[in-house]
Regions:
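Structural motif
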Residues: 32-41, 88-97, 144-160
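Loop/turn-rich, solvent-exposed surfaces of beta-rich toroidal or solenoidal domains
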Residues: 76-94, 186, 192
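Secretory pathway targeting signatures of secreted, lumenal, and periplasmic proteins
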Residues: 186-237, 242
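Conserved blade-ending motifs and adjacent loop-strand segments that build the rim/top face
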Residues: 107-127
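Surface-exposed loop/turn elements that mediate protein-protein interactions on large endomembrane-trafficking
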Residues: 1-4, 38-58, 94-113, 158-168
Length: 288
């Protein structure tokens, strides 16, 4: 039988108050065109509206590339991470949790009235990036000395939240979404590296650079290359290269460069392997 009927753009089913029963949260537009999250609870076999809260994105921004992620706060409380994408370029993320039985937006700015979690969209969404059981929000940051308009120049800081809405950076990554991989940036790298991209028919390389105290120019530290084409097996074992992974006919290789040798934050081949990951299909797909 029918329990309720409502218009919506996306929805989530999750036990937000940890009572063993799952609540239904639907995202819709109100009469003024604003985005609203409605939380319904089941009472006597009927879904009843418990509370509502405004969200920071329009339903158009949510419906196209947006996503609703059921996740967990640093305080081990369940939460909904609502991501909308404005103009295909800016990611806006709200973090919704129940406080005293009321749906609350933990990242709402008292000054602007919308989420403080806004940054360049890089086709990644909230997830547990490090396997600690807590959901992190991706926040893009321009690498030092780089043009903010260049997607290649963005690192991703992964931010966790507690029940009071306090943010904490957990780690930073460099995501090469176009080529299907990301690297967890080692200690000391996030504020000290920038990147360059080079392409040829069978090789696409990302080179990490740092500044040198002995030279005015930047020096290369690490290069990660995606090899395709018929010569990839031979090219993968070229002197200095080490294999990081394989996927769909592509071999990913690393190469430690001269800037790594005497640098305070130098890395080993094994450390690069441990920090390298392939991007799964779930990264770039929105859902309910």
């Amino acid at each position: 039988r029918e329990l309720m009927r409502t218009n919506y753009v996306k929805y989530a089913v999750a036990d937000l108050n940890k009572d063993g029963k799952r609540e239904l949260t639907v995202l819709r537009a109100n009469q003024d065109g604003e985005g609203v999250a409605d939380c319904y609870v089941s009472k006597n076999g009927v879904l009843t509206l418990r509370s509502s809260v405004l969200v920071s994105m329009t339903m158009a921004e949510l419906s196209q590339q947006g996503k609703v992620t059921v996740g967990v706060l640093r305080s081990n409380d369940p939460a909904l991470f609502i991501t909308g994408v404005a103009d295909g370029a800016r990611a806006i993320t709200d973090v919704l949790a129940l406080r005293g039985g009321e749906l609350t937006n933990l990242v709402l700015s008292a000054i602007t009235g919308v989420s403080g979690e806004v940054s360049r969209f890089c086709s990644v969404y909230p997830m547990d990036i490090n396997g600690d059981g807590v959901t992190e929000v991706p926040r893009t940051v321009t690498l030092q000395g780089e043009d903010a308009d260049h997607a290649v120049s963005q690192r991703v800081d992964w931010i966790s939240y507690d029940a009071s809405g306090t943010a904490s950076r957990v780690l930073s990554t460099y995501h090469d979404v176009a080529d299907g991989w990301y690297l967890q940036l080692p200690e000391g790298w996030p504020e000290r590296v920038w990147v360059g991209r080079s392409t040829s028919p069978d090789e696409i390389g990302i080179t990490f650079y740092t500044d040198s105290s002995r030279e005015e120019s930047y020096v290369p530290v690490l290069r990660i290359t995606a090899l395709s084409g018929s010569e990839r097996e031979r090219l993968a074992v070229r002197t200095g290269r080490f294999i990081l992974g394989r996927n769909d006919g592509v071999i990913y290789v690393g190469e430690l460069l001269k800037g790594n040798q005497d640098w305070k934050y130098s890395v080993t081949e094994d450390e690069v392997r441990a920090s390298f990951s392939l991007i799964g299909t779930e990264w770039s797909a929105g859902d309910n």
